[in-house]
Amino acid sequence: MKKRVIAVSAIALASVAVLAGCRSHDASGTSGKVKTDLKAAIVTDANGVNDRSFNQSAWEGLQSWGKENNLKKGTGYTYFQSNSASDYTTNYNSAEQQGYKLLFGIGFSLQDATSAAAKNNPKSNFVIVDSVIKDQKNVTSATFADNESAYLAGVAAAKATKTNKIGFIGGMQSDVITRFEKGYVAGAKSVKSDIKVDIQYAGSFSDAAKGKTIAAAMYGSGDDVVYQCAGGVGTGVFSEAKALNSSKNEADKVWVIGVDQDQEYLGKYKSKDGKDSNFVLVSTIKEVGTVVKDIADKTKDGKFPGGTIVTYNLKNGGVDLGLDNATSEIKDAVAKAKTDIIDGKITVPSK
């Protein structure tokens, strides 16, 4: 079966602004008449719904959808927490047994488990987020042009660095994280061709201690902007940046670039010279929550896009850059690069 690719409209992503302000972790639905009998759930990867990143965004999107349809958490919508890869199949089985018929696998590591669950449950609909499953009519593949938002982050990093050295910390090597890496490097070098980019992988998406160690080495070697694309590993990067910046005057701060959602709220600290400050330069935003809500709405209306790849990019608002603490110079450079990417003047590498 030939795979169809869908370009998502900006209208379909109009709920981005609403979701951006959503940070509730205890939504249980609202009063009123239930608007659908569709039961939807997400199966997380090992980082869980409080990862301040990818899974959290997905859960926020499902909560928003559930509340809009007057569903109750635990009966109309829910999440199944995976503590390791061995939980994926068990969680899919549990979701099926509890009557959930729209199931989202959050992250490329769930690809095999999602494919198998879809084959075993042909009357249910599945969505693999951040990966591609081919030739299964009851599976939608939701992918992101992460390289585009990462390119903008690279532009920002190159404009912000004082040392001409910046860093990139990936979780585990994969096609998805490679997109971030390649876009970031290309964006930085479009501003400064001689900039040095230190690239390291943690070999994990959950080892915060490893993230802290890598970040300490990067900052110690002169990297003054570090982009972390590593799930829970990023927690350690933020921890190291906060500790280091708290011992410095504000003018000497080092930066972190956030990922998947606007992570500016993680960058608050007090500098050595007593100033309340923030070390998150910008954040690459992946509207995972909007994807969940968008596809759930389509499914509710009988229009589940099964057997397709749904692509979210800069043009349709599926990815973007939160400008957080960017200067006006950085904002202008990012705006130009964004326009050029959307207009096709810049082709961002992904491999």
From Swiss-Prot:
Question: What interactions and quaternary structure are annotated?
Answer: The complex is composed of two ATP-binding proteins (NupA), two transmembrane proteins (NupB and NupC) and a solute-binding protein (BmpA).
- The answer to whether the entry has keyword Iron-sulfur is no
Q: What does this protein do?
A: Part of an ABC transporter complex involved in the uptake of all common nucleosides.
| InterPro entries tied to this protein | BMP_lipoprotein, Peripla_BP_I, PnrA-like
- The signal peptide here is 1-21
> What name is this protein filed under?
ABC transporter nucleoside-binding protein BmpA
Family designation: Belongs to the BMP lipoprotein family.
User: What phenotype is described for loss of this gene?
Assistant: Mutant is unable to grow on inosine as a sole purine source.
Q: Which SUPFAM superfamilies match?
A: Periplasmic binding protein-like I (SSF53822)
Q: Name one GO cellular component term.
A: plasma membrane
Instruction: Spell out where lipidation (S-diacylglycerol cysteine) occurs.
Output: 22
Keywords on record? Cell membrane, Lipoprotein, Membrane, Palmitate, Signal
Q: How does it sit in the membrane?
A: Lipid-anchor
Q: What domain of life does the native source organism fall in?
A: Bacteria
Inducing stimuli: Expression is induced in the presence of purine via PurR.
Which Pfam families does the record associate with it? Bmp
Which residue numbers carry lipidation of type N-palmitoyl cysteine? 22
Q: Where does the protein end up?
A: Cell membrane
